[in-house]
Amino acid sequence: FGVSNFTQTYSDVTDNSFTITIDAGEGEPFANTWTCTGEGMLSPEFSQMPGGMEGMVSIDFIEAEGVTLPSEEMFQPGESWTTRYVAEAVIGDAASGELTMTQTIEMTNNDIGSEAVSVPAGDFDNAIRVDTTGVVTMAMGDTGMTTTIDMNYSSWYVEDVGLVRQEFASLFGTEGANNPSVTELLSYEDQ
């Protein structure tokens, strides 16, 4: 997928929600509003995709349930939680032909525990590692064709910082154990 940089900004923070705006430097910044409950935080869409997929697919998320990140009580080694999304996706464009599909993304997230991680933004001794396994089920328009794709990735979170590293070992059927897609925090500012 190559190397890309982006800026992520948090705003409109309340007890029940906050907005994350992602600016990749090209085009309009992308914003979504997360909800916060006693169970944890839920992103309205699956936004953990690695960079480089811009322009390939248009996705409209129509359902989100479960928890993206759990409450502090659940964010403990050995705990797990689920997240589920349903989306309508369009691949291609009107000129060359479009393929419409419904995607269901079902994920199980497992808190592996704390470990040290080094990224350009610094060295963190107590990053919480979360391993995610998931299945993307795609129903291809009116064709009746359905396919499933396994997805596996690990994320490292640091208290008072957030996500500092994410590594996709398997994405859309492409094994990446020898060359995973990696996102790392370059820098951050306390607000």
Residue ranges with predicted function:
Residues F1-Q191:
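Conserved functional acidic sites
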